[in-house]
UniProtKB/Swiss-Prot annotation:
Family designation: Belongs to the eukaryotic ribosomal protein eL14 family.
Highest taxon listed in the record's lineage: Archaea
Recorded GO CC terms: cytosolic large ribosomal subunit
Keyword NADP carried by entry: no
Lineage: Archaea, Methanobacteriati, Methanobacteriota, Thermococci, Thermococcales
Gene name linked to the record: rpl14e
Organism: Thermococcus gammatolerans (strain DSM 15229 / JCM 11827 / EJ3)
One GO term of the biological process aspect: translation
Annotated InterPro entries: Rib_uL2_dom2 (IPR014722), Ribosomal_eL14 (IPR039660), Ribosomal_eL14_arc (IPR023651), Ribosomal_eL14_KOW (IPR041985), Translation_prot_SH3-like_sf (IPR008991)
Protein name in UniProt: Large ribosomal subunit protein eL14
SUPFAM superfamilies in the record: Translation proteins SH3-like domain
NCBIfam families (alphabetical): PRK04333.1
Amino acid sequence: MPAIEVGRIAVVIAGRRAGQKVVVADIIDKNFVLVTGAGLNKVKRRRMNVKHLEPLPERVNIERGASDEEIKKALEEAGISLE
């Protein structure tokens, strides 16, 4: 299983957004990360418990705390869809 790290694509497995893909934008502490759908799906930029995420093998090369626009551009360059 891939580790939770900045730029990692993950699937939300709990809560109202379960089943949707997100990008880890920042690591807050050992239990929480900042995730975003980068405007490509309905997941807004928010804090999420790492226990509610299932990391995928895909990863985009972004800086820690990158904006949604930067993340969206990196996803398009990598050819990764969050649908």
